[in-house]
Amino acid sequence: MKRIILSLSLILCVMTIRAAVKVDRIDPANWFVGMKNTSLQLMVYGENIRQADVTTDYDGVKIDSIVRLDSPNYLLVYLNLEGVKPGEMTLNFKNGKAVKKVKYELKAREKRGEERMGFTNADVLYMLMPDRFADGNPDNNDIKGMNPYKTDRSQPSLRHGGDLEGIRRHLDYFKELGVTALWFTPVLENNSPGGSYHGYATTDYYRVDPRFGTNDEYRRLTDEAHAKGLKIVMDMIFNHCGFEHPWIKDMPSKDWLNTPEWLYDRKDKTKAEVNRKYMQTTYKLTPTVDPYASAIDLKETVDGWFVPSMPDLNQRNPHVIRYLIQNSIWWIETVGIDGIRMDTYPYADADAMALWMKTIDEEYPNFNVVGETWVSDPPYTAAWQKDSKISQRNSYLKTVMDFSFHAKINQAKYENTDGSGNGMNRIYENFVYDYLYPNPSSVMAFVENHDTDRFLGNGRDTTALKQAMAILLTVKRIPQLYYGTEILMNGTKEKTDGYVRKDFPGGFPGDDHNAFTAGGRTPEENAMFTWLSRLLHWRQGNDVITKGSQTQFIPYNGVYVIARRYNGKNVMTVVNGTGRTTVFAVKRYAEVIGHNTEAKDVLTDRTVSLTDDTQLEPRKVMILEF
C-alpha cells in the first residue's frame, strides 16, 4: 500500500510539474498607451507556453487574438489598448489548473508623436563605431558568457572596448567640431563569435550589448546629447538577425526565416548536401526595381542570406514585421532617439518595409528614417525615396543614401577636370539626376563610411579632402561625416574592414596621443580640425544652405561652381578641379553674381572680387558668400 501511495504521489508530482506554466520572457517588456495604433503584439516565450490560455481583467484591455505558432515554446497575444490608461496589468496564463500571473507595465508616453523631431538637411550627421571611438568604462570590456569574451586592440577584426559611456564623455567634442547629430553603428546585443564589434548581427532586439553598456546608459547618453543640442540616430537591421539569436535554435514558426531549409539538415546531412540548400543573396539589388525582373532573381536577392551567420528574416510573415515595427517604436519611446538608419534596406521585403515606414510616419510625422540603398546609380536610389514618380510602388522612405555621390567624389578627387567627363564633371552629372528625386534635400550624401575605403586612402593629402568637404556641406543634401575625417584618419579595406575602422586616438587607455583636444592633436590634425569646424559652425542655421535654390554650372576651364540662393543672399562653391592654376572667370556666372562686386571667402575670411577674374591655385576651393 505504501508503494502504491508513493507511486501515486510521484505521478501527481510529475503531472504538476508538467502542468506548471512557464513564462520566461515577453517582448516587448513594457508598452505605451496613447499610441495612434492601439494594437499590441506580445511575444511570450516559455516551455510549452503554446497551449496556455490568456486572460486579463485590466480595465479596457481587450484580447483580440491568440496565435499558437509551430514551436511549443512561443505564444503571440494581440491586445487592443484603445482608451486604456497607464498602469500595471496582470496577464493570467492558464494551462489546465495551473495559472501563472505576470505583471506587465503600460506606461504613459513622454511626448506626443508629433513632438518628436527627426534629423533634416539642417543637420550634419557624424557617423561612428562605438567599439572604435572611446572606452569610457573598461569594466564592461570582457564579460563572461559574451562572444568573443576578450577584447584585443591588436586585432583589427576583434572588439576593442569602446562603449556608450565613451561617447557620452565626449559630447562636448562633437559640439566643438560643429556636427549636430550622431549616428553610430548598432549597439544591441551581438552575442556571436567573430566580428561582433560592428553590431550587425542582433541576438536580442530589446537589450543593449552589455559590452557597450545598458539600456539606461543609452537613455542617459540620449538625454545628455539632447541637452547639448545633439540628435541621436539609431542603426537598425530588419533584414536579418544574428545566428545566435534564440529564434534560430527554436524557430517560432517554419516561415519565420527565408530559405531556412538548410538549417533543418545540418545535423543529418553531409556538408555538401547542406550547402546545396543554403541560399545566399546575390547582392544584386536591381531586381527590386526592375519591371522585368525574373522571380528567381528577385528571390535570390531578397530571400538569400547576407552571410551564413546572419539568418534572413521573413518580413512577409505578418507576425515578424509586427515584431520589428513594435521594436522600433519601443526604442523611440524608451530612449528618445531622433532618427533611424536602416541597414540593408532593399534586401528586406519591399511591401513589409513600406508598411513599417507608413506606421512610423503616422505615429511620428516629423521623425526621419534613412535607408541604406547601396547602388551607385541615381535612378535606382531615387526609386526608393517616398513618393517616387519612377517606381512601381511607394516605399514611404523619406531619406535615401547617395552612393552615387560617394562613388563619383572618390573617382574625381585626383582626376583633372577636362572635356572628357572626368573630375568635377562627375559631380556635376550626379546632381543632374536630382530631377528624379521627389525631395533632393532629403537625400543623405557622404564621402566615406564604415563600409568603404577612407577618402584619404593610405595618404594624408588634404587638398582633395577639403574640396570634397566644401561640396558636401554646401549642396542640397543631408551631409554625413565619418568619425576621424576631421583629424585625417586614413586606411583602406584591402586587408580587412578593420583598417577603415581604426580606434580614435585618445579614446583608449595607453593611446600615444589624444585627438579630442587641441593640445593633444598633431599640427596637421589641428589644421584640418580647425578648417572643418569653421565650415560646420558656419553651416549651422544657414538658411541659404538648408532652404535655398541650387544652380550648378558645367565645369569650365577646370572650374566647377555650385550656387545657392535664398532671400537675396548667395553662396557660391568654387572648385578648381585640376592640378594646375586656372582662372575663375566671373562673367560666366553673372546670373548669380548680379550687381554684387565682392564676396567673402568663408574658408579664409578673404575678400574676393566679383568684377575681376580670380586665379585659382591647383585644387583650390572657395566658398563665397555675398
Locate predicted features.
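Substrate-binding/active-site clefts of carbohydrate-active enzymes
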Residues: F133-T180, F184-I329, T334, M353-E363, ...
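Carbohydrate-interacting/catalytic domains
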Residues: K97-K100, E105-V124, K175, I487-F626
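Immunoglobulin-like IPT/TIG beta-sandwich domains and homologous Ig-like subdomains
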Residues: K36-K97
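Active-site clefts of carbohydrate-active enzymes
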Residues: P438-R460
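Beta-strand/beta-sandwich contexts
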Residues: A20-R50, L106-R109
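Conserved, mostly hydrophobic/aromatic
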Residues: L128, F174, F184, Y205, ...
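Bacterial Sec-dependent N-terminal signal peptides
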Residues: M1-R25
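Active-site-proximal helices and loops of the catalytic beta/alpha 8
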Residues: T222, H240, K249, N327-I329, ...
